[in-house]
């Protein structure tokens, strides 16, 4: 099988849960983006690219549910995983807090353009979404946005930038992704992996 794992904060948890499920994978180096073990292949990619790799042919991947939702990729998600837990939230400067339902015409900075549009659409609110790749919390400070939608773990970064959470958009955790064709053509291997990880999760990963 071919696996694709996310660089960054989810890599350690991904390797740990696979090891506990019986897949002994060494941690890839920064320059070593592909490695092989027991006839399997492991790729290392940006978290936001993992669903794309899986949709287009890599058998199995792990990334955050926020990424899966934002990408909208056609992949099978058999399991939520017990790490990478945080939330995607709407936040804005504490001195100008406004209910989401009253934010018609507001500018929202985020790297989650699709999720943000869907969130406000569900409220019947029209906003301007400003797509940023990082340091989203700076946007209200410099006046290019009224609010942000971003990942929140402890809230420390928000507080440091004078922002407060207004609403939770979605809960986030790591997820196991499976290519839809591989799910059929490699059923036994995929099923064994899913069952092994389920046991790890049940025992407390």
UniProtKB/Swiss-Prot annotation:
Reactions catalysed, as given in the entry: 1-(5-phospho-beta-D-ribosyl)-ATP + diphosphate = 5-phospho-alpha-D-ribose 1-diphosphate + ATP
EC category name: transferase
Record-linked InterPro entries: ATP_PRibTrfase_cat, ATP_PRibTrfase_CS, ATP_PRibTrfase_HisG, ATP_PRibTrfase_HisG_short
Metabolic or biological pathway, per its Swiss-Prot or TrEMBL entry: Amino-acid biosynthesis; L-histidine biosynthesis; L-histidine from 5-phospho-alpha-D-ribose 1-diphosphate: step 1/9
GO CC annotation terms, alphabetical: cytoplasm
Disulfide bonds: none
EC nos: 2.4.2.17
Classification via Pfam families: HisG
Tagged with keyword Glycoprotein: no
Keyword Glycosyltransferase on entry: yes
A GO biological process held by the record: L-histidine biosynthetic process
Molecular functions per Gene Ontology: ATP binding; ATP phosphoribosyltransferase activity
NCBIfam families: hisG
PANTHER family: ATP PHOSPHORIBOSYLTRANSFERASE, ATP PHOSPHORIBOSYLTRANSFERASE ATP-PRTASE
Function recorded in the entry: Catalyzes the condensation of ATP and 5-phosphoribose 1-diphosphate to form N'-(5'-phosphoribosyl)-ATP (PR-ATP). Has a crucial role in the pathway because the rate of histidine biosynthesis seems to be controlled primarily by regulation of HisG enzymatic activity.
Protein name: ATP phosphoribosyltransferase
Organism (species): Thermococcus gammatolerans (strain DSM 15229 / JCM 11827 / EJ3)
Gene, per the UniProt record: hisG
